[in-house]
Swiss-Prot record:
Coiled coil: none annotated. Cell division protein that is part of the divisome complex and is recruited early to the Z-ring. Probably stimulates Z-ring formation, perhaps through the cross-linking of FtsZ protofilaments. Its function overlaps with FtsA. Residues 1-59 are annotated as: Disordered. It comes from the Bacteria. It comes from Lactobacillus delbrueckii subsp. bulgaricus (strain ATCC BAA-365 / Lb-18). This is Cell division protein SepF.
Length: 148
């Protein structure tokens, strides 16, 4: 009877507990091996977010835009959100308004992890994150006298 109390409170013979622990460890190892040998469902491994699928479903677009007022910046930002690159020509805006639009678009591009580059006099290229741009045309802008 004394042993039953010791066993109940954990002061008894530890051999039975060691055997139980060894059995549980062996069972866990077998279960883990069975799960790793189980074929993966191809449907589970090809999960793609809806937004990512929509962005790559059609051809990529580059939008040409000439804003005239500051409120046009919202439409430019919406195109960036829709994964479209935008070439923006500010030649029809005064410098102060153009600077405000560039600041707005720069904030949008930063939030999306995209890029904005000046590619000409009052012309900018804004791209969403999945676009990559290479090269520079500033050398041509410096030599514009030789082109005409």
């Amino acid at each position: 009877m004394n042993n039953k109390f010791k066993d109940f409170f954990g002061f008894g013979d530890n051999d039975s507990y060691e055997e139980r622990d060894a059995y549980e460890e062996h069972y866990d190892e077998q279960e883990e091996m069975q799960n790793s040998n189980r074929p993966t469902n191809s449907r589970d491994s090809n999960v793609v977010s809806i937004k990512a699928g929509q962005a790559g479903s059609g051809p990529s677009k580059i939008v040409l835009y000439e804003p005239r007022v500051y409120s046009d910046a919202k439409e430019v930002a919406q195109n960036l959100l829709n994964q479209r690159a935008i070439i923006i020509n500010f030649s029809r805006m005064d410098d102060a308004s153009a600077r405000r639009v560039v600041d707005f678009i720069t904030g949008t591009v930063y939030a999306l992890n995209g890029e904005i580059q000046r590619i000409g006099d009052k012309i900018f290229l804004a791209t969403p994150p999945k676009f990559e741009t290479d090269g520079k045309i500033t050398e041509l802008l410096d030599k514009k006298d030789t082109l005409g």
